[in-house]
Amino acid sequence: MDRNIRSTDDVLRLMDGLFARGADRWTADAGSWWDGFYADREKPVPFFVAKPDENLVSYVERGLIAPGRVLDLGCGPGRNAIHLASLGFEVDAVDLSPSALAWAEDRAREAGADVRFHHGDVFELAATEPTLSGPYDLVHDSGCFHHLPPHRRISYLALLDRVLAPGGGFALTCFASGEGGMGSELPDDAFYDREGLRGGLQGGLAYTPESLRRIFSGLTEIELRRMHDEPSDSPLFGEPFLWTALFRRPAAETT
């Protein structure tokens, strides 16, 4: 008989374990699944291109974010981390997949970009690794958040609260609901019935603008829009089935 639950983290880990093993895309145990996903570098996956997100480039060009410390969540093959490093940002990039990180490191060497890559679950790493404890001037997420089950939003918000500097920016790209969008539009509770626990997140969760504003209501919205559709010959990545959002943490109060 186990009676070991005494914290929120214990409850969250218990809920992680309710999902079928093959449905896991977010814990450290999911690294092997993502390794298989990234094994073929020639696979026609839109975000395998070595191009930065168009919205991220736009934020820099418009002065909405400036060089500083960056935490890139779920960096994959590193395209956005490398772009930011090339502009003088000090970048820590985290991913569950050793294969994705090996690809990112290859790209960084080719580009002459200085990025610190970290392997593991960012929720665990940020709590145990002093180098990832923040504060960060920018937390960037292009495609990580929508692979989290609903209960892990608690961990995500706690991470932002812990590592994002006062006045810092939070840049998010995630699946959009509605026409032309992508991802599951099932309500949160549907993922916790028997079928949902067996099937997992169905490729990722779609979000409405209203749900993003509600989830990140502790931050100030700077911009929230559909990602621009970039042509294949563009130097930028852009797919309109994604939301792009920039939020800012309120600056510390002065006395």
Predicted regions and their residues:
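Class I (Rossmann-like) S-adenosyl-L-methionine-dependent methyltransferase catalytic domain
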Residues: M1-L73, P77-L132, L148-L159, G168-T255
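A conserved beta-strand element that flanks and buttresses the S-adenosyl-L-methionine
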Residues: H140
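Short catalytic micro-motifs in class I SAM-dependent methyltransferases
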Residues: G143-H147
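Short, conserved loop/helix-junction motifs that constitute active-site signature segments
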Residues: R162
